[in-house]
Amino acid sequence: MNPDLRRERDSASFNPELLTHILDGSPEKTRRRREIENMILNDPDFQHEDLNFLTRSQRYEVAVRKSAIMVKKMREFGIADPDEIMWFKKLHLVNFVEPVGLNYSMFIPTLLNQGTTAQKEKWLLSSKGLQIIGTYAQTEMGHGTHLRGLETTATYDPETQEFILNSPTVTSIKWWPGGLGKTSNHAIVLAQLITKGKGYGLHAFIVPIREIGTHKPLPGITVGDIGPKFGYDEIDNGYLKMDNYRIPRENMLMKYAQVKPDGTYVKPLSNKLTYGTMVFVRSFLVGEAARALSKACTIAIRYSAVRHQSEIKPGEPEPQILDFQTQQYKLFPLLATAYAFQFVGAYMKETYHRINEGIGQGDLSELPELHALTAGLKAFTSWTANTGIEACRMACGGHGYSHCSGLPNIYVNFTPSCTFEGENTVMMLQTARFLMKSYDQVHSGKLVCGMVSYLNDLPSQRIQPQQVAVWPTMVDIHSPESLTEAYKLRAARLVEIAAKNLQKEVIHRKSKEVAWNLTSVDLVRASEAHCHYVVVKLFSEKLLKIQDKAIQAVLRNLCLLYSLYGISQNAGDFLQGSIMTEPQITQVNQRVKELLTLIRSDAVALVDAFDFQDVTLGSVLGRYDGNVYENLFEWAKNSPLNKAEVHESYKHLKSLQSKL
């Protein structure tokens, strides 16, 4: 054990094990997660060479092989609980992604949420065992987030009781679905439904694309891999073109919308019910943002405790770089953010399942806010985590640029989250649409509930500076509850600004669509402020549920740092809204620096509490034992370029040197 890390752990003010239990949900969940992780760590079938040194084709082959082993092992060990499946999957491929991932994250959830009982009986068991390997084919070459613009068609033929699927244009070719290129034999295809000559919008269809047994594409199907990408080397993101391809009527998922044998269309209770899978994935992605940022913080903070550089005072020993205030300022707000997102992710998971149960009972009342909240928080957390991961990499200096740090892999494999399942700016605008509707309700004298209930407090449906002029004396920068109120006022103010600017543009431009576009910057800022408020609120409320005093104290410091750092980075909003005064902003900036000092002694213990196995981090720099330099040298020696003392390419240089 590196002596610096041992000293850091000995000086912690709390027991990291107890905090791990809180993050997992209970001591029993921690015990079971570790039990599952050890199944993999102690199983020789899951050992493999470092994927960093393999070609893309080799990485894909390893990923497919290990995915097949994973399914067999889960069956052998009786792992069926969704959380346990996630733990198992997260460790078996370390920091990399799996070709069959969408089978479990989208194909099966869509079948569960939108399939009839008969459809689930037909396909569910086979998809869980990978006899059917499914993917989710929504995005097309020409359209992604704009779902209504998708061009793939499914035209019903009542004579044969079949749907005829077509990709009528080049831009209608399905493009990007993971596992589509070479792995999957089925796809849930989103297509424009046409029956009796009339279009009814997007619906989901289960489409066989390869013959089971030979794995060859079926007649009418053109399918393949789209080529190398920024990351995701193990995933065969693919394309799918369909030419008059017929599937039975029963292959349309019909839990909500239906097409009768004669072609009669039966509409669902709500069109948004067909977007259930996207809402599920977006809520899941909030937790994934927390996980990715937590891993990056673990690597950067451990390395910063091991790395010694420069001199604070001439002639003195080189300090740990974690002792530099600038390094703390880079990393500790990100650590606070990681914890905030951990708690928000747990909230979103719980909220999704609660509301989804209600939807199953026919209660759609909370669906609009769930859709808006998952869209906004997916964007807010993924943008923040993506920027934060890169900041952690840069905080590790030159070694952070090496794949040995694990940070490049974390970054390139997380960054697609800013685009898939809804491009983030568009997601923020979807949240803004809900905020504008809520504002209009309040303006018309109605009350709103849920996370937007703060809009009910708008005095006479307006926030005016003179009406909140007394507010600055009320803000307590040492109180999470008081800071939550400040964020609430900021959100309300920016929502009102966006709403009033939108109204002005509507009057001036006459067209709501043009007005919306010309107000979109304000609308995105309103959504960001709303999401920021939600995160601060949930973090603050989580503190009240923590019973261990030492853990509550350190989490309170993190909550304060997250809230105050956000104010310092958005000071203009709090000043312009007369929510805080300039002297208070100065106090905020000073308090942020004080909190850096308070958190310093607990930083390593806080990342230890995330409880990532070394193999999960995939990082030489973030090793639990802190033995960085010895292992960095060993890692480099494994480079394929080092297999020969003289590389075969030397012949090109030798010919030049012979002329000297």
From Swiss-Prot:
The modification N6-acetyllysine is found at residues 216, 255, 267, 272, 437, 446, 500, 512, 637, 651. A motif (Microbody targeting signal) lies at residues 658-660. It is found in: Peroxisome. The record marks 468-469 as: Cleavage. The modification N6-succinyllysine is found at residues 89-90, 241, 349, 437, 446, 512, 542, 637, 643, 654. GO terms for biological process: alpha-linolenic acid metabolic process; fatty acid catabolic process; fatty acid derivative biosynthetic process; fatty acid oxidation; generation of precursor metabolites and energy; hydrogen peroxide biosynthetic process; lipid homeostasis; lipid metabolic process. This is Peroxisomal acyl-coenzyme A oxidase 1. It comes from Pongo abelii. The gene is ACOX1.
